[in-house]
């Protein structure tokens, strides 16, 4: 799908976290964030995008730093509630537009998912993330499958793009990343402010991909994510992105 701007979009719903324990996703300890800024002057800018046809809900939670894994799972539930309204009580969507981004509206279900995932002060293991989400979905008469998209130590972008086209989000478990705090587009200049998180654990629900090309040569690729404390942001696909594990989530 080509537009005047050459746009590929890999949107993610991101959930910030850090951890001391390697197997755990989500803990406030050991986080380091640095800020950098990049300015790109251009004569022509193209953008390509590929994303699910509807956005994911941006559920907020009390503790964004340790609840990233249940938040990622709960966002997947909200996304699939569009097709299977028995997953959550209340309305998440009106048409394809998200009308309820408050987890307080689904408090009982969120707490149930946290308990099923065995949420601890150190976070949630990938194994318990999958087991907890599976049990939650099966209690409501549905099933969930997890298909790995890992290849050569990272998430395979092509598999992810095919998943988005099939209306399936991808959960990623990260050991490091950075995200766009601000992207200003004025005249023929893009100014991008990045925050880098190193030595962290963090869970992300990805639902699209975006590629900017400037003057045919300079490329910037991103996952668009929901960060919990920053809302929807772009997460660069670059050397800072360290994917430990990743799965397509398919609820039927």
Q: Which residues does each PLM region occupy?
A:
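N-terminal secretory signal peptides that target proteins for export/translocation
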Residues: 1-4
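Sec-dependent N-terminal signal peptides of Gram-positive bacterial secreted proteins and lipoproteins
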Residues: 6-27
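Active-site-adjacent structural segments surrounding the nucleophilic cysteine of cysteine proteases
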Residues: 24-126
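Extracytoplasmic/secreted envelope proteins and their assembly/folding machinery
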Residues: 65, 69-77, 130, 134, ...
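Structural recognition of the beta-strand scaffold that forms the well-ordered cores
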Residues: 67-70, 75, 146-148, 169-174, ...
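Substrate-binding/catalytic groove segments of enzymes
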Residues: 84-86, 140, 144, 212-218
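Catalytic cysteine-centered active-site loop
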Residues: 96, 139-155
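Active-site signature of cysteine proteases
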Residues: 157-158, 165, 174-252
């Amino acid at each position: 799908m080509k537009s005047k701007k050459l746009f590929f979009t890999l949107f993610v719903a991101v959930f910030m976290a850090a951890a001391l324990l390697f197997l755990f996703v989500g803990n406030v300890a050991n986080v380091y964030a640095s800020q950098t800024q990049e300015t790109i002057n251009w004569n022509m800018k193209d953008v390509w995008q590929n994303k699910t046809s509807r956005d994911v809900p941006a559920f907020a939670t009390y503790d964004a730093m340790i609840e990233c894994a249940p938040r990622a799972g709960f966002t997947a539930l909200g996304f699939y509630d569009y097709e299977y309204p028995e997953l959550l009580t209340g309305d998440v969507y009106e048409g394809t537009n998200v009308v309820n981004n408050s987890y307080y509206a689904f408090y009982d279900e969120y707490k149930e998912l946290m308990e099923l995932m065995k949420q601890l002060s150190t976070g949630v293991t990938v194994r318990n993330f999958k087991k907890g989400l599976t049990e939650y979905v099966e209690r409501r008469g549905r099933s969930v499958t997890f298909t790995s998209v890992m290849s050569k130590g990272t998430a395979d972008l092509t598999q992810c793009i095919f998943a988005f086209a099939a209306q399936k989000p991808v959960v990623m478990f990260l050991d490091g990343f950075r995200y766009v705090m601000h992207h200003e587009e004025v005249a023929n200049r893009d100014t991008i402010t990045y925050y880098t998180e190193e030595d962290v654990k963090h869970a992300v629900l990805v639902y699209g991909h975006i590629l900017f090309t400037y003057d045919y040569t300079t490329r910037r690729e991103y996952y668009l994510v929901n960060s919990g404390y920053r809302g929807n942001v772009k997460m660069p696909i670059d050397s800072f992105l360290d994917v430990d594990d990743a799965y397509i989530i398919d609820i039927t």
